[in-house]
Amino acid sequence: MTVLKMTDLDLKGKRVLIREDLNVPVKDGQVQSDARIKAALPTLKLALEKGAAVMVCSHLGRPTEGEFSAENSLKPVAEYLSKALGREVPLLADYLDGVEVKAGDLVLFENVRFNKGEKKNADELAQKYAALCDVFVMDAFGTAHRAEGSTHGVARFAKVAAAGPLLAAELDALGKALDNPARPMAAIVAGSKVSTKLDVLNSLAGICDQLIVGGGIANTFLAAAGHKVGKSLYEADLVETAKAIAAKVKVPLPVDVVVAKEFAESAVATVKAIAEVADDDMILDIGPQTAAQFAELLKTSKTILWNGPVGVFEFDQFGEGTRTLANAIADSAAFSIAGGGDTLAAIDKYGIAERISYISTGGGAFLEFVEGKVLPAVEILEQRAKG
């Protein structure tokens, strides 16, 4: 994958527009989770160190396009950046017809989704973005799967279009895990439905040596193997699909599970052998014996890809399976990459972020890359690099 990299460019005195993913949860005007902003900071600092006039843009939430809405304003992000960078970061609402930014200064543009034509990737808007800068830097892996004005269109028209350090690191890490992984490779794919992760499962079945499934996905695989899953969430219409995937790759199944009679924070958890699951049981986690077996598998792996908690870890009594596997990944010498919102929440909960080789900032983009799909915002950077 050949793209121009911001790190290789001379940016002194250049006007540089950086597309970041600053789409963070905001409540009462305060940033609730700053992971994405923190991930972007090294890129912004580097651009300033290189002597650029820095303009930063992002979306936040899903406002009605073309209309300002206070709840989707990037004002709380501008305030956060001001503190983090130790300098005033002005938030500019009116920027499409040109702005004055001096070398060594940094400004944040208001939510790109307030601009008509952003989501449709309209040429007219993309050309306006491109006219603002000498260099466009795409650094938002989390939105790379969307061809929009500020992720794709601007890269078509800008004088120079490059990948930022964060995007480049994502592509390198995913390439290392998927293109030529050190073996054996294990993948953990968990979630409520096989249908939403079918392409991921099929893609990984052709790459990895062990495919560990969890959540509702595991229940469908259990049903496919002839086990009773009680009133657990599973997809009867995808049992044959699960059988076909299990014929292509080793899918170790739980030998014991944690069940409850209801899905609730106060639900009583009971450990049962898989053969003992009753008709009114809901499987909400893998059992301790299964967790130990899966942890052993992970210990011998050289590459681990993790997407999704294996149980309802938000409720502590159904979180032991996820905690055990999270710690096994953290303790492993393997190259480990983790992605997806729930996965990041589990990593936070169990305090293992420092011990995962690479944590992807992208949710949908992470999954689409794993599926083998082309990410439009990356593809255009490759095309521009060819000249």
From Swiss-Prot:
<dbReference type="GO" id="GO:0043531">
    <property type="term" value="F:ADP binding"/>
</dbReference>
<dbReference type="InterPro" id="IPR015824">
    <property type="entry name" value="Phosphoglycerate_kinase_N"/>
</dbReference>
<feature type="binding site">
    <location>
        <position position="36"/>
    </location>
    <ligand>
        <name>substrate</name>
    </ligand>
</feature>
<keyword id="KW-0547">Nucleotide-binding</keyword>
<dbReference type="InterPro" id="IPR036043">
    <property type="entry name" value="Phosphoglycerate_kinase_sf"/>
</dbReference>
<dbReference type="Pfam" id="PF00162">
    <property type="entry name" value="PGK"/>
</dbReference>
<dbReference type="GO" id="GO:0006094">
    <property type="term" value="P:gluconeogenesis"/>
</dbReference>
<dbReference type="GO" id="GO:0005829">
    <property type="term" value="C:cytosol"/>
</dbReference>
<feature type="binding site">
    <location>
        <begin position="340"/>
        <end position="343"/>
    </location>
    <ligand>
        <name>ATP</name>
    </ligand>
</feature>
<feature type="binding site">
    <location>
        <position position="314"/>
    </location>
    <ligand>
        <name>ATP</name>
    </ligand>
</feature>
<feature type="binding site">
    <location>
        <begin position="21"/>
        <end position="23"/>
    </location>
    <ligand>
        <name>substrate</name>
    </ligand>
</feature>
<feature type="binding site">
    <location>
        <position position="197"/>
    </location>
    <ligand>
        <name>ATP</name>
    </ligand>
</feature>
<dbReference type="InterPro" id="IPR001576">
    <property type="entry name" value="Phosphoglycerate_kinase"/>
</dbReference>
<feature type="binding site">
    <location>
        <position position="113"/>
    </location>
    <ligand>
        <name>substrate</name>
    </ligand>
</feature>
<dbReference type="GO" id="GO:0004618">
    <property type="term" value="F:phosphoglycerate kinase activity"/>
</dbReference>
<feature type="binding site">
    <location>
        <begin position="59"/>
        <end position="62"/>
    </location>
    <ligand>
        <name>substrate</name>
    </ligand>
</feature>
<keyword id="KW-0963">Cytoplasm</keyword>
<dbReference type="InterPro" id="IPR015911">
    <property type="entry name" value="Phosphoglycerate_kinase_CS"/>
</dbReference>
<dbReference type="GO" id="GO:0006096">
    <property type="term" value="P:glycolytic process"/>
</dbReference>
<dbReference type="GO" id="GO:0005524">
    <property type="term" value="F:ATP binding"/>
</dbReference>
<feature type="binding site">
    <location>
        <position position="146"/>
    </location>
    <ligand>
        <name>substrate</name>
    </ligand>
</feature>
<protein>
    <recommendedName>
        <fullName>Phosphoglycerate kinase</fullName>
        <ecNumber>2.7.2.3</ecNumber>
    </recommendedName>
</protein>
<keyword id="KW-0324">Glycolysis</keyword>
<comment type="similarity">
    <text>Belongs to the phosphoglycerate kinase family.</text>
</comment>
<keyword id="KW-0067">ATP-binding</keyword>
<keyword id="KW-0418">Kinase</keyword>
<comment type="subunit">
    <text>Monomer.</text>
</comment>
<keyword id="KW-0808">Transferase</keyword>
<comment type="pathway">
    <text>Carbohydrate degradation; glycolysis; pyruvate from D-glyceraldehyde 3-phosphate: step 2/5.</text>
</comment>
